[in-house]
Amino acid sequence: MNISVIIPVYNVERYVERCLLSIINQTYTESVECIVVNDCTPDNSMKIVEKLVADYKGSIQFKLLCHKHNRGLAAVRNTGINNAGGKYIVHVDSDDYCEPDMLEKMYIKALETDADIVLADMWRTYPDHEEYCSRQIVSLDKIERLRGCLVGRYGAIIDKMIKRSLYVNN
């Protein structure tokens, strides 16, 4: 498995279909798993997810996981990481969506550079406008970069592909 995409689900029935379809419609799907973690959502989010996954006929492997009680976003991310088999991990929040070639471009860059972390540009969408965000990162050791990514120092979580070994070994 090359890429594990982790999607948290809690009270996102308005957004989760677009999010999941943006993963399903990626140009690179051959060695991708999508781990959806239900954090005891009170709405119909998981019914939407389950229908999309049941109807899906492609090569992405899906894992649907469920917490026994609501534990919060950090616990959801940890559950996803602990169940991930990919060399790289991408976190996609349920209200986010990806450009169709995002995984392909990021994975190619990771292979070309043997990167621990790949950052991508992204769009931020607001009610009245959209804003293009270009990513630049200073040279730091890989642990400091990982910490910065996880606390939002380098933008949103969706624009990063992080080597799984950074999580597991640190």
Report residues per predicted region.
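Nucleotide-sugar donor-binding/catalytic module of glycosyltransferases
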Residues: M1-N170
